[in-house]
Swiss-Prot record:
Keywords: Ribonucleoprotein, Ribosomal protein. The gene is rpmA. The keyword Ribonucleoprotein applies. InterPro entries: Ribosomal_bL27, Ribosomal_bL27_CS. One of its GO terms (molecular function) is structural constituent of ribosome. GO terms for cellular component: ribonucleoprotein complex; ribosome. One of its GO terms (biological process) is translation. Gene3D superfamilies: 2.40.50.100. Residues 1-25 are annotated as: Disordered. NCBIfam families: L27. This is Large ribosomal subunit protein bL27. It comes from Dehalococcoides mccartyi (strain ATCC BAA-2266 / KCTC 15142 / 195) (Dehalococcoides ethenogenes (strain 195)). It comes from the Bacteria. PROSITE patterns: RIBOSOMAL_L27 (PS00831). Belongs to the bacterial ribosomal protein bL27 family.
Amino acid sequence: MAHKKGAGSTKNGRDSKPKMLGVKRFAGEKVHSGTIIVRQRGTRIHPGENVGLGRDYTIFATCEGVVKFEPTTNDRRKVSVVAD
């Protein structure tokens, strides 16, 4: 039996690419219709006025305006777009 391991492949070396989640437009920033405001997994931040919720829970603006974050009940946050 060989007392040295052959030149086999390592068991490491795999990783998934970053998902680039998080807030993309902060409070007070002007946005256009269709601008992504938050990318998230699940509804960590809930949609408010003038925003839409994508099927991957991405929140995006549905009209032109200014981003506004506000707290709601039970330690939840809501994001809205205040139209100009």
